[in-house]
Amino acid sequence: MQGWVREEGHCNTGAAGVDVSKHELVVALAGASTVMRFSNDTAGHGELCRRMSKAQRQDGRLRVGLEASGGYERKIAATLRKAGLEVIVFQPAQVRAYAHYLGQRAKTDPIDARLIALCTAAYQGQTRQVDPRIAQLAEHLTYIEQVEQDIVRFKTRLDGFTSGRFKTFIEADIKRLKQRRAAAIRALVKALREHPDLGQRLDLVAGIDGIGERTALALVIRMPELGSMTREQAASLAGLAPFDVQSGKMDRIRHIQGGRTRVRRSIYAAALPAAFKWNPAIINLYQRLMAKGRSHKQALVACARKLVIYANTVLQRGTPWIKTTQNQ
């Protein structure tokens, strides 16, 4: 297998891009005119790590960028990190935005690999340090989320039948899935509590009125950065921070965008019962916003954002939630 060929007039920026598919990895170095291909399996991962390590020894620090590909990228990302390489996993929207910036319309695996390499070279943010314990727990949580999606699908399917016989079958399926979900949650909590520090974080978050065990799991596992950031950063990471839309005389209503979808979905689901029953401070916030003319959805988003801020605060302080009717 031949190595990378550098383009004349270009230098390596210390960045590589990996286009990940189910069976193949297409890899490009920033400033290289060629790409290399590896199988997306243990043997291919080992060969890629050797190549990347060699490139790092030759050129100094090397960052490897990958695009999230429905989970196909997880194994190679973990392998590269284990080999001591700095890895950045981009969301597809980030890579597409960079392609628009470059005016790149064509799309092939080699083009995507080069694009990811350039995106990696231009990236100026901090590289997220991944806790291997969290990665394993996240896969367990993903399974629970998929079971929950199956329950929703079966409930929708139930509404489309009038035959009692078929309704009975579907109701049995729903019951079975709910039992599986409950068992999976119990197993996840048990696995998480094997790590005392994570168990403590779970207790602190679950102790907030309105945040149940299921939502607390999502926050602890999907947002391990909680407790080490500002309240504004926490809200933005969850995709619950409102962004201004203003230019010249145009001044539109602020809206939320981006962030971690799964976290936002979990915390938004918790916001409704919190705003109507469980958390006096959130109930007060919801009623105050509605009195000011905000829509139900706007008020709920604000309540969800406040719950994330509460979680960030208790983890920062390391002290349990104190019940209050006042907005904190």
Which residues make up each language-model segment?
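Intrinsically disordered, low-complexity and often Lys/Arg-enriched segments
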Residues: M1-N12, V35, K323-Q328
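Gly/Thr-rich phosphate-binding beta-strand-loop-beta motif of the actin/hexokinase/Hsp70
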Residues: W4-A30, I116, A218
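Nucleic-acid-processing active sites and adjacent nucleic-acid-binding tracks
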Residues: A32-R63
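Short glycine-rich phosphate-binding loop at a beta-alpha junction
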Residues: G60-Y72
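Long, charge-rich intrinsically disordered scaffolds of nucleic-acid metabolism proteins
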Residues: R81, I88-G207
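Phosphate-backbone recognition surface of nucleic-acid-processing proteins
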Residues: E213, A218-K292, H296, K323, ...
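Basic, amphipathic alpha-helical segments enriched in Lys/Arg and hydrophobic/aromatic residues
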Residues: A291-Q328
